[in-house]
């Protein structure tokens, strides 16, 4: 049984991961600003906290819960994300900041809070996008989103290097097109071949076993692009 934190659990891949981890008997801490979807499942061993990862005081509730109930964290999956599909010259600096606050600084925030509570075998899995991979197909209008996901990839590589003597593992998955509400927002009407549950199954397995084979690695998880 592992102690697993997942961010961005109100819908899509995050919600499916909560179900899968719980079904396998793991303890799950589901973090999202909207906790109702997870609470409605009434799953054993799943605890929800209404949390905004961009706010440090919001994460203090997470730290307090871990210290009082779990004592440690085995797996952290940074799945929460924000997207903006808007032409570059029409995107304000404030809009760029909002995307980076969730996709980069929010991830930094929660890793800094939870890493001291991880054993040497702990695994941090960051969820990026194929749009953030150098040399991959890019789409106009996603300059804020894709560049933030590129930053997340580099951050993961740097953390793996910095903590390689401690035993902690950091990996990043660049996801391709998946049938989620978030993709529908960016590409209205497009129906990718992969379902959220299918991608969730892959991420769950990787988060539990991937650190045996990878550290500081970018894995491209995609069989198509929009």
Tell me what each language-model feature is.
Residues 10, 18:
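N-terminal Rossmann NAD(P)H-binding glycine-rich loop of SDR-like oxidoreductase domains
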Residues 24-39:
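Conserved glycine-rich Rossmann-like NAD(P)H-binding loop of the short-chain dehydrogenase/reductase
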Residues 51-61, 93:
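The beta1-alpha1 cofactor-binding region of Rossmann-like NAD(H)/NADP(H)-dependent oxidoreductases
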Residues 79-85:
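Conserved NAD(P)H cofactor-binding loop of Rossmann-fold oxidoreductase domains
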Residues 87-88, 95-97:
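Substrate-binding pocket helix/loop in short-chain dehydrogenase/reductase
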Residues 125-151, 156-157, 161-164:
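Catalytic loop of short-chain dehydrogenase/reductase
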Residues 165, 172-173, 188-226:
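C-terminal helical subdomain
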